[in-house]
From Swiss-Prot:
Predominant subcellular localization, coarse grouping: cytoplasm
Organism whose genome encodes this protein: Methylibium petroleiphilum (strain ATCC BAA-1232 / LMG 22953 / PM1)
Span list, region A: 1-339
B: annotated segments: 340-557
Its job: Molecular chaperone. Has ATPase activity.
Protein name: Chaperone protein HtpG
Segments of this protein annotated with the region C: 558-625
SUBUNIT field: Homodimer.
UniProt family annotation: Belongs to the heat shock protein 90 family.
GN (gene name): htpG
UniProt keyword Repeat, yes or no: no
Pfam families per record: HATPase_c_3 (PF13589), HSP90 (PF00183)
Length: 625
């Protein structure tokens, strides 16, 4: 192939501009990203060589080499991994549709620390080289191809790049950065070693640099020909826990997760028995941008006997714990394990169950800690990941009780952080149920008319506003013997909390209101399944409820927003016979208008939308004149 000049994908040009102008204060990350890419390339070779050992050619020892040239003002990161063909170079470096560039660009915040973290998460770390370089040259040959099939790629990171054939004896890839003016600090072995130590010390491959000795005559260090390893080059998780410091655990997390925020907690265990494996699992402090994508790439890397197998080992962690990051290294799985085999393996099932228990144990330790700081950490975790953890209540029957104890809610007595155990401890004498209401927002829930009698009697009600709540509650019926009861479903029955005088008064009011009630039922027969007198209202004239077996208006709206069809069932209108508006109904010449407005206001009060807002406005106008 003769030299070709090709144009970058438009989004890549935008990305390059942002990288060079937005991440300057975090410029050290370029070395982390390029070493990480080199390590990945070696992992891929090791994996492909399981089925074709000839890919190793004459070099089975995998390594990453970092070098610099003061005269030429270049830094080179080279690996002897899988390498790339000419087509792969063009696809991977010129167009990066697979890397989610558009989404990456949309997520850039202008905060340099956050943006530096994102660049690795979105798989566009190669381009971080342009933070310090005004030109990058890549030379590569894919393992298994002839020496004549090497390729050179070069670009100044502007609008286009050049590609040409190259005779390259060694497989793998070298990335050479031609430094910008003012970046000479990186032309130093001490500087490069310090960056490698900070970000890449736990890369499981050796990272080599040329040795240096002090030259007394020149009063400077002189580079030697011999190469020496500058990182620990050992899998952190395989080392004894007693030899690993907290700082090393956190450094490893930052290196493999591309997350600069320290994790909330981690657990490191060697499991022996029916299945033997090592697990090193972390709870991140911040939710990823695609947390709600259940098909998102997971955070668990699978190794078998220290050999990297796959990045996204979803079968090793349930979907509701998809935010967990870490490494699982099995001694039992075959090296050629496939994703399909992972779904069926008994060993994988044992690893999944064991890992789930470890993660829940970390959460329980934080949530139940006597240390207020640890409990605050759990509160922070819940704000980031609580809604996803709720999925487990319906998906993980074996751990449902443990998950129920970890749930946290807002309530009429607290803005957040109320556990079901907290609620039970505050229940009124004679209270027989745990009461809750679902709504789109906490404010809407807090001001819902269905809460009025509960507020009057000082009964706490949980305020549920996550989209997953209704689904979760279809699987969680009780907690420690107390049923969970929606205040917007069925007839209100406060049992022993309602005295006999109140009950008799309500029955008498209902009897006196019967003629008006029948007329209301007839007027609203197309909109309401029933109309009845209620004791749940104190200040509001009316509210909507549904039968115990029907879906709530809130859930019906969520299904509609998701483009799904909801079962059609009419709500029940409950009226407060003590309210002036309801009293006006009796004998009113505008009965129909009043009845319809009463229903419309109840719809609005529960967060619903009117089918015909114009008709509502016309009725209100007629009643006002």
């Amino acid at each position: 192939m003769n030299k070709q000049t090709l144009s970058f994908q438009a989004e890549v040009q935008q990305l390059l501009h942002l990288v060079t102008h937005s991440l300057y204060s975090n410029k050290e990350i370029f070395l982390r990203e390029l070493i990480s890419n080199a390590s990945d390339a070696c992992d891929k070779l090791r994996f492909e060589a399981l089925n074709d050992a000839a890919l190793y050619e004459d070099a089975s020892t995998l390594e990453v080499r970092v070098s610099f040239d003061k005269e030429a003002r270049t830094i080179t990161i080279a690996d002897n991994g899988i390498g790339m063909s000419a087509d792969e170079v063009i696809a991977n470096l010129g167009t990066i549709a697979k890397s989610g560039t558009r989404e990456f660009v949309g997520k850039l915040s202008g905060e340099q620390a956050k943006d530096a973290q994102l660049i690795g998460q979105f798989g566009v770390g190669f381009y971080s080289g342009y933070i310090v370089a005004d030109r990058i040259t890549v030379e590569s040959r894919r393992a298994g191809l002839k020496a004549e099939e090497g390729v050179r790629w070069s670009s100044a990171g502007t609008g286009d790049f050049e590609v040409e054939n190259l005779v390259r004896a060694q497989r793998g890839t070298s990335v050479t950065l031609h430094l910008r003016d003012g970046e000479d600090e990186f032309l130093s072995a001490w500087k490069l070693k310090s960056v490698i130590g900070r970000y890449s010390d736990h890369i499981s491959l050796p990272i080599l640099m040329r040795g240096q000795v002090w030259d007394a005559e020149k009063s400077e260090y002189v580079t030697q020909d011999a190469w020496e390893t500058v990182n620990k080059a050992a899998a952190l998780w395989a080392r004894p826990k007693s030899e690993i410091t907290d700082a090393e655990y956190k450094s490893f997390y930052e290196q493999f997760s591309h997350d600069s925020t320290p994790p909330l907690a981690y657990t490191h265990n060697r499991v022996e028995g029916r299945s033997e494996y090592i697990q090193l699992l972390y709870l991140p402090a911040k939710a990823p941008h695609d947390l709600w994508n259940r098909d998102r790439q997971g955070g668990i890397k699978l190794y078998v006997k220290r050999v990297f197998i796959m990045d996204d080992a979803q079968a090793l962690m349930p979907s509701y714990l998809r935010f967990v990051k870490g490494v699982i290294d099995s001694s039992d799985l075959p090296l050629n394990v496939s994703r399909e085999l992972l779904q069926e393996s008994r060993d994988v099932k044992a690893i999944r169950e064991g890992s789930t228990k470890r993660v829940l144990g970390m959460l329980e330790e934080m949530a139940g800690s006597e240390d207020a700081a640890r409990r605050d950490q759990y509160a922070a975790f819940w704000r980031e990941f609580g809604a996803v953890l709720k999925e487990g209540v319906g998906e993980d029957h074996a751990n449902r009780e443990r998950l129920a104890k970890l749930l946290r809610f807002a309530s009429t007595q607290a803005d957040e952080g109320v556990s079901l155990a907290d609620y039970l401890a505050r229940m009124k004498d004679g209270q027989e149920a745990i009461y809750y209401i679902t709504a789109d927002t906490t404010a809407a829930a807090r001001h819902s008319p269905q809460l009025e009698v509960f507020r009057k009697k000082g009964i706490e009600v949980l305020l549920l506003t996550d989209r997953v709540d209704e689904w979760m509650l279809s699987h969680l019926f009780e907690f420690e013997g107390k049923p969970l009861q929606s205040v917007a479903k069925g007839a209100v029955d406060l049992g022993k909390l309602q005295d006999e005088g109140e009950k008799q008064q309500a029955e008498a009011a209902a009897e006196a209101f019967k003629p008006v009630l029948e007329k209301l039922k007839d007027t609203l027969k197309e909109r309401a399944k029933d109309v009845r007198v209620t004791t749940r209202l104190v200040d509001s004239p009316a509210c909507l409820v549904v039968e115990d077996g029907d879906i709530s208006g809130h859930l019906a709206r969520l299904l509609k927003q998701a483009g799904q069809s909801a079962p059609t069932s009419l709500p029940i209108l409950e009226v407060n016979t003590e309210h002036a508006l309801v009293k006006r109904l009796d004998g009113s010449e505008r009965f129909d208008d009043l009845a319809q407005v009463l229903f419309d206001q109840a719809v609005l009060a529960e967060g619903g939308q009117l089918d015909d807002p114009a008709a509502y406005v016309q009725r209100v106008n007629r009643l006002l004149v």
